[in-house]
């Protein structure tokens, strides 16, 4: 990878809390418009990696060096609204509308994610799939050049999962941005990713799925569980968000 195509670089990054090692000697380059999937067991440091990239925590050692300017769109693993806080969908999305997109581009996102009928709804009353679509829209409205999806399938019904898998596949062309996808879904990662990083407090292995599948480190962690198929049931509306 040449320097001109590099969007983000993590160089010899380690993170400790006291004597507890959460991440050690992480070296990652993410290129412009590249999609990178991150997998690993519970406690592997995936959430810590995301926090380091977002700048929420500072490495104990090493450097996280973004290109300038770096605009990150982030869809968190969990999102909760206090019951006493009234927050409409339109209010949440308005926070992301910073005039980086044209009105036509914003409307395209609303249509693609089937959001128009949700705008007056309270966030507290949305289903898991509806909440995920709103959070994805909020991230896209910031016109990111790096989109981070942290366990995007968590808590979704099967129909919404199928739609979101396909939408994620289309996002690089739609957005023209890099993506970092943290996922526990080994089957989707191994079948649908071009570059995978296997994390277990350090980088165990990385590369194309076919390369990881024969890696001894990968086999120790996951065996052949990724071969258990995700059943994709095509339906007429799979190109659009479930209503």
Swiss-Prot record:
Pfam families: ABC_tran. One of its GO terms (biological process) is response to zinc ion. One of its GO terms (cellular component) is plasma membrane. Its EC number is 7.2.2.20. ATP binds at residues 40-47. It catalyses: Zn(2+)(out) + ATP(in) + H2O(in) = Zn(2+)(in) + ADP(in) + phosphate(in) + H(+)(in). It comes from the Bacteria. SUPFAM superfamilies: P-loop containing nucleoside triphosphate hydrolases (SSF52540). One of its GO terms (molecular function) is ATP hydrolysis activity. InterPro entries: AAA+_ATPase, ABC_transporter-like_ATP-bd, Metal_Ion_Import_ABC, P-loop_NTPase. It is a peripheral membrane protein. Keywords: ATP-binding, Cell inner membrane, Cell membrane, Ion transport, Membrane, Nucleotide-binding, Translocase, Transport, Zinc, Zinc transport. It is found in: Cell inner membrane. It is an enzyme of class 7 (translocase). Disulfide bonds: none annotated. The keyword Transmembrane does not apply. The keyword Thylakoid does not apply. Residues 8-225 form the ABC transporter domain. Part of the ABC transporter complex ZnuABC involved in zinc import. Responsible for energy coupling to the transport system. The complex is composed of two ATP-binding proteins (ZnuC), two transmembrane proteins (ZnuB) and a solute-binding protein (ZnuA). Belongs to the ABC transporter superfamily. Zinc importer (TC 3.A.1.15.5) family. This is Zinc import ATP-binding protein ZnuC.
């Amino acid at each position: 990878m040449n320097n001109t195509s590099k969007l983000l670089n993590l160089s010899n990054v380690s993170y400790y809390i006291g004597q507890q090692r959460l991440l050690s000697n992480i070296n990652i380059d993410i290129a412009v418009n590249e999609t990178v999937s991150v997998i690993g067991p519970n406690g592997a440091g995936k959430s810590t990696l995301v926090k380091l990239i977002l700048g929420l925590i500072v490495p104990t050692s090493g450097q996280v060096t973004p290109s300038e300017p770096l605009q990150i769109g982030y869809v968190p693993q969990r999102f909760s609204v206090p019951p006493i806080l009234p927050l409409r969908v339109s209010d949440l999305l308005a926070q992301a509308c910073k005039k980086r997109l044209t009105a036509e581009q914003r409307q395209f996102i609303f249509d693609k994610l089937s959001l128009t009928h949700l705008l007056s709804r309270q966030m507290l009353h949305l289903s898991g799939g509806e909440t995920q679509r709103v959070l994805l829209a909020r991230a896209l409205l910031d016109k990111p050049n790096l989109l981070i999806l942290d366990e995007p399938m968590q808590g979704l019904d099967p129909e919404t999962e199928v739609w979101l898998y396909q939408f994620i596949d289309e996002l690089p062309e739609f957005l023209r941005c890099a993506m970092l996808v943290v996922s526990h879904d080994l089957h989707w990662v191994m079948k649908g990713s071009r570059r995978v990083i296997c994390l277990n407090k350090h980088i165990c292995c990385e590369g194309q799925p076919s390369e990881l599948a024969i890696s001894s480190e990968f086999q120790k962690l996951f065996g052949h569980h990724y071969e258990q198929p995700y059943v994709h049931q095509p339906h007429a509306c799979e190109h659009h968000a479930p209503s």
